Structure formats: C-alpha cells, structure tokens
Amino acid sequence: MGLLSNRIDRSSLKPGDHIYSWRTAYIYAHHGIYVGDDRVIHFTRRGQEVGTGTVLDLILVSSGPSRNHTHCPTCVPPNEGHGVVSSCLNCFLAGGVLYRFEYSVNAAHFLVKARGGTCTLAVADPNEIVVHRAKHLLQNGFGCYDVFKNNCEDFAIYCKTALLVLEGRTMGQSGQAVSIIGGPIAAVLSTPMRLLTTNVYGMAATAIGVYCASRYATDIGMRADVAKVEAEDLTRRLSSGLFQVLDPPLAAIALPSTS
C-alpha cells in the first residue's frame, strides 16, 4: 500500500484485515472483514434496510456482491434473518480490485486521502479479536442496514475497533458516507464566506477546507461521542431494543467555527 492507493495483492491478506472494493464507477465501496481461508464476512442490505428515498438507494443496492443466478459452491447461504453474510473472496470482490483499509494513520496522511472510506485515525484491535467479532456478528446480526448510520463500512470499522457512536442524532463511523454528502454541504456552508473573496480559487479553497475539517472532525478516531462496546454486549442490546438505527440530520456533521 502507498500514500495514493490502498491496493494490495491477495497474497498479503491476513485474517482480521478490513478490506474493500469499489463499486458503481468508484462512487461507493463495499467493505468487509477477511477471516482467512478465502472467506470474507460483510454486512449487506437484505430487505431490512433503512433507505434515503433518493438515488443513493440505487447506488448502495449495487455496492454488495452481485446476486447472479450462478450458484457459488463455496459460499455459505445467507441468513435471511439479518444482513451479515460470509462469502468467498471472489464473490465479495465481484470482479473488482482488492484494497485494504488503513488504521492509525496520522492527520496529514488522513487529509491527503481526500476520498473518505479508505483510512481512519482510530487504532485497530488485534486481528484475532477482530475475527472473533466478525464471526459473532455473522451468527447474531448487526442491526438494521442504514445508508448513513449502519452500513458495510460501519460494520467493518466496528469489527476492527469495537467503537460505536452512542448519540443517535449523529452520523455513524462511515467515512464514505461523510464524503458522499460532505462535499455538497461544504459548498453550501462555505457560501457566506464567499463574501470575503471574489477570487474563484479562494472560493474553492474555502469549500475544500470546510470539507476536510468535517471529515477530520467526524472520523471515528476523533469523535468524543463514541464508546467501546464488545460484540456480545452489542448483540444483547440490539436484541433487547436498547440500540436503534435512526436517520441522522445533515446538520449533525461537525464543522469548524467561523469566529
């Protein structure tokens, strides 16, 4: 892996790796946890998802492995009760390129990766613990799929860190969810600052600054509203209804002060 690309060869995969592959012309990526023996555990939409009612739903439907009519002899039939599934690596990639998500990156590295959903400032737990969490959630589920609060990237980041956002009105861990809506929001919120400059380059720099600040502030490794919740406790709370997926308002994205 390098500064500009997280692409890796299959030979370098280790159990516990958080991997992903781009879908739909690089608009969105599908994420999962490699658990060894050519297997990937990942979170998909299986008819229980909370959608947006927008074109994003069509994009995210295609983020998971394609459901073709050819039966894969090595893949485990999915549990229809929840969206956590185990697939072979080929089915997970669905013809795409393999990438590895990075953890414990520094601030400069994080901001250079302008596209969200490729790295985080958060520290990952040991790989054997990551695999245990993924396998536990395969048996017990990860709640209801939500585009912004509980998607495949949120699942993989949780398996790696056990960190959860506890405040229901804010966004989940997903960096690519912030990227999808962060750009338009940055453009809107930087509009008042355009009064301070008529230079087109200054306007662009302002919008980029707001976008980068929002990505940095909402990264799971920087947020103050997160807690470590182990998988057994998480699934117990999910089954008892103590955790619920709610639609977060866009205003929940942290932004820099203009004062």
From Swiss-Prot:
What residues sit in the active site? Answer: 30, 42, 152 (acyl-thioester intermediate)
The record's Gene Ontology biological-process terms are: cellular response to lead ion; lead ion transport; phytochelatin biosynthetic process; response to lead ion
| Keywords per UniProt | Cytoplasm, Stress response
The LRAT domain covers 20-168
Q: Which GO terms describe its cellular component?
A: cytoplasm
Source species, domain of life: Eukaryota
Tissue/organ expression: Highly expressed in inflorescences, siliques and stems, and, to a lower extent, in roots and leaves.
Q: Where in the cell is it found?
A: Cytoplasm
Q: Specify the inducers.
A: Induced by lead (Pb) stress (Pb(NO(3))(2)).
Reported consequences of knocking out the gene: Increased sensitivity to lead ions (Pb) stress mediated by Pb(NO(3))(2) associated with a reduced Pb accumulation leading to decreased phytochelatin (PC) synthesis and related gene expression. Higher sensitivity to hydrogen peroxyde H(2)O(2).
| PROSITE patterns (alphabetical) | LRAT
| Record InterPro entries | LRAT_dom (IPR007053)
Q: According to its UniProt entry, what is the function of this protein?
A: Confers tolerance to lead ions (Pb) stress mediated by Pb(NO(3))(2) probably by promoting Pb accumulation leading to subsequent glutathione-dependent phytochelatin (PC) synthesis and related gene expression, including PDR12/ABCG40, GSH1, GSH2, GR1, GR2, PCS1 and PCS2.
Q: What is this protein called?
A: Protein LEAD-SENSITIVE 1
Q: Which organism is this entry from?
A: Arabidopsis thaliana (Mouse-ear cress)
